[in-house]
Amino acid sequence: DWNTLLQNASHSGGINDSQIKLPLQLQWTANTGSNIFMTSPLIARQKVFIATTDDNTSLNTYICAFDFHSGKQLWKFRTENSVKNTIACENGIVVAQDASCNLYALDAASGKPLWQQYINLKNYPYLTEGLTIDKGIVYAGIGAGLSAYDLKTGKVIWTNTDWKQREGSTTTLTIAGDVLISGTQWGGLYGNDIRTGKQLWK
């Protein structure tokens, strides 16, 4: 499975040459019905997951699932706004955050919503960052809205209160040991404790 950007919450995975069987052949193509920005496809439970953007009308914004072998669309869930960046999947739950600061958790098998949370970014209204999951915890948002959530219930575990963003970025939250790493354009690189949310360094 390929559950998130570069396979793990540290974004340090990859495929070496010995795992690639040449020559590569196109197996299928599928139309998502909209554009894709920085959302990398996920592979989990014999499905491929992707999210879309629509900056013109916000009418064609979805999280989609396709059959891994055939490319047949299995389900499509409409989001309120564009999903700009990394989505993730763990234990049969797909999570994504949209530009309007909504955090979604969907059942990977059916696409049915399990829970939804609003990420309060205070004075910054637009979310373009990517999220991550590790050991049943979802890390999402940025700055004043940077938070940890229980994957199963959506319950907020902690919210960052130590720093606020002045602008957004195109980064994806990354875990290194017990540190959650995030950043903002021209603002800095931040490390927060993954257990408490306390800022450790900038």
Q: Which residues fall in each region the model found?
A:
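Blade/loop signatures of beta-propeller domains
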Residues: 1-26
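A short loop-to-beta-strand structural motif that recurs across blades of beta-propeller domains
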Residues: 61-64, 102-104, 144-147, 188-190
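Extracytoplasmic beta-rich repeat domains
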Residues: 28-42, 52-61, 75-90, 115-134, ...
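Short loop/turn segments that connect beta-strands within beta-propeller blades
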Residues: 67-70, 107-110, 150-154, 193-196
